[in-house]
Amino acid sequence: MLIFQQQAFALPSYARQTGEACVACHVSFPELTPYGRLFKLSGYTLGTTQLFPVAAMAVASVSKVSNTQGNDSSYPRNNQLQLEGGSLFIAGKLGDHAGMFSQWTYNNLNSTTQADGSTAFNGKTTVDNNDWRLSWHLAKADLDLIYGLTLNNNPTVQDVWNSTPAFGYPYQSSRLASVWGIGPQATLIEGGLAQQVAGLSAYAFLNKNWYAEIGSYRVADGPFSFLSHGVDLSNRLSGNNPYLRFAYNRDWGMHSLAVGVFGMDAKVHADGTDTNSPLDHYHDRGIDMQYQYLSDPHIFTTQLSYIHESTDWDASHIGNDRATANSKLNSFRAKASYWYQHTYGLSIGYFGEHGTTDWTAWSNTGSPDTTGYILELNYMIKPNWRVGLQYTGYTKYQGASLNYDGNGRNARDNSTTYLYTWIAF
């Protein structure tokens, strides 16, 4: 499973609802400020109800892989201007205690592999991230409690800190890189269940310091199928699967700090198309940290996360795509950003995957280990219009820096330059 495919945007519909500028809620999209976190935890209910809480966005880009090794057909649309697609959002206050974030996305770079090995592109519209909330606020002299329920379709999409996977860095990345099969391996909670599940959680935020959330996820079918509309259930859950999140938050002066833990246990059918197929058991545990210095004109933010995944594989895998009945995968992410006047941005990121040696799963090197870095420059033409230049460099790929595939391809050959622009309206 590959990562670096999430996209997230600030919504003009929320700005119209609250009467606030985009920078009130966001450091840089989608990094939330303390006010933005309270807005989300309050169920998107701050402000006045809008008759049409609708917004949209569009993305165009150019992606260039470092080296095709003369095999250009394996990297279709390399170094070509592309309209990636766009999204429609229904997002805003539904009532005093109810609000929503619902995204539907048209992917113009949706691809399929043909019988002759070529790649065909065909646009496709599917459901994207959804977060529907009920919330209440209890305020007294010595007590400030926000509590509520969230129904969502992507574990951690409901989180208000940008150190967990769904809204973690990179916030924008090349869709073509995933078409080309380029990207680090990922734990299940890092997007493996996105738009395939329905989760219900109860949460509470006490005195703007302590956050707790307990929930459960199941497959998004039957009455919940709208949460997976158009998406293949490649990782079909069995039964109810617990999710936990705890964090400590402190805001003082221009500073904001949060540290937390999160985790999920998941029973996943070995064959997503067969509800009678055997089950694989995933155990994902994460720790995370976020720090923000929110001044004017200087802003600095950083996020860290570490996820440990242990997977118990059904016996049907052994000798086929796995050598052992249990494997482990560790994922580390770090990112730091600097913004000047909310207009000029620089971000530096690091990613590392380290897993169990398995010569059946990784026949060339025996290892999924992948490491690399991300450098990104941003310019905000307007508060709702961004231009970005991003470089993702690989120092190790699937267990090796050199000749990782046995055919002479090196890790650095997968490094990708990504020039993009997006606009929300």
Role assignments for model-derived ranges:
Residues 62-68, 108-114, 140, 155-161, ...:
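Gram-negative outer-membrane beta-barrel proteins
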Residues 21, 379, 409-425:
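Outer-membrane beta-barrel "beta-signal"
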